[in-house]
Amino acid sequence: MIKHINKLMTFGLIATSSIGFSQRLEDDIKVQTTQKLNEVYNLVNQNYLEEFDGPKIADAAIVAMLKELDPHTYLIPKEDVQSSNSQINGSFVGVGIRFQIMDDTLTVINTIEGGPCEKVGVKAGDKIVTVDGRSIASVKLKTSDVRENLMGEKGSLVVLGIYRKDEKEILSYDIVRDKIPLFSVPSYYMASKHTGYIKVTNFARTTPEELMNALAKLKSKGMKNLILDLQNNGGGLLSVAKFMADQFLNEDKMIVYSEGRKYPRENHIANDKDWRGRYYGGVENGAYEKGKLVVLVNESSASASEIVSGALQDWDRALVVGRRTFGKGLVQRPYELSDGSVVRITVARYYTPSGRFIQKPYDGGVEKYYKDKSNSFENGEYMHRDSIKLPDSLKTKTLLLGRTVYGGGGIMPDVFVPLDTMELSKMYRKISRKGLINTFTFNYVDNHRDELLAQYKDFDTYLNAEITDKSMMSLFWEYCEKEGVDYDKSDYKLSENIIKTLIKARIATNIWDFSKFYPIYNANENEIFMKGLELIEGKYINKLKLDY
């Protein structure tokens, strides 16, 4: 017995000693690495032949170091932190306009409802020519210059000099900067009598309230089916993805789980007690647990979008329609550095409820990782489902109906919709690269705003009207030729629909706001949306017996 105890004690000492030695070794390596970095910097500082920018060199070293880890661990320089946080926070401080720079002139497309500029009477079509008495016209104005001039501290004053048609003198407006919302739900509407549509562009702190407001409005209009559009949504906050999925899944269903080297497994479950009983815009949490649901995704849907679509697919709650998603299955956490810059470090992997890890491989380096989309295009993966490699080792089953789904590189939709490349003619690509549809429609509305508003009393009237008639298209082609793009009859035949659709949609956004883009674009050009609408209102979705 004593021998046995002694053996255990000896083993315990060896184990403890081994753990202690391992920890000391790890600490020694950390110290040596830090010393090495400092040593090289000091040698450069003491001996390099010319003066150099120390902070710039340090940032470059940090960027190179983080690049060796994974594509999503990176440094945000101090000067970029505010704009980066704006997307996550869902707001920024400014004057409240949507603008476009035309011929080196800052022109107001429209004012943001309730914002500082709207309150004092700034109008769509106004041209901002001075800021605090300084001319900003004809100085090769860039978007970054506009932000620098118009953004600032909440409550601070900026004086704008504005040129307005039919006014003889420059108008002066005192604007008090305020918090301006960045909408992550830019559009929602009834796509048919019983089917609602919600577009979500990212997962920000304001998204829960925006989503619930949209659901409440659509329910009040008789919505029985819902299309949730996550196309081109690159993600955002994990907590917001959890909230969104919770609106469609009933109690106690897992949404996602995460796990990392320093972070033990954490399960994220529907109907978290922190949200139970909360109301948003008159709708209680768990807002759409019953009813047909289709989720739209494509190759630019990533991260939080994949958490939501993966959870709803795994629980057989929704039909996922579109093309395979980006494949980002890593969780980042931000850490502020002493100089105000921020480093975002990957701390965990996330897994869908069925256990799928959907991060695509990145062992070939960052450049190869981000070229994967163009490689997928060249390999035909966007045009043909059969071109996508789906080995049996990546197969798993959904949790209720046992349908086959795949991990290992994005969420594979239940219904694949190929990308139509035929309409992307050589002529159209030139028009697109030069941004000619945007500039033409902007100028057209700027010159015809009053008559357009008189002709189309509301958006519904405009939506059902034929806008791109012969006279409109004649003006467009004259403009294109002036800008160096010649009309090609055969190319136009291929691209007619997309060109006319975008002209009509962009005119609408310039007359009203950006929410009006989607009803026009979806109904005429968005094939993933059209397939989703067909499926949700047809018999196919009923045959699947999804959990609705």
Label each residue range with its predicted role.
Residues 22-33, 37, 41-54, 77, ...:
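Cleft-lining beta-strand/loop regions that shape enzyme active-site pockets
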Residues 357-358, 362-548:
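Conserved functional hotspot residues or short segments at active or partner-binding sites
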Residues 305-308, 337-338, 351-371:
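Functional cores that coordinate and move charged inorganic groups
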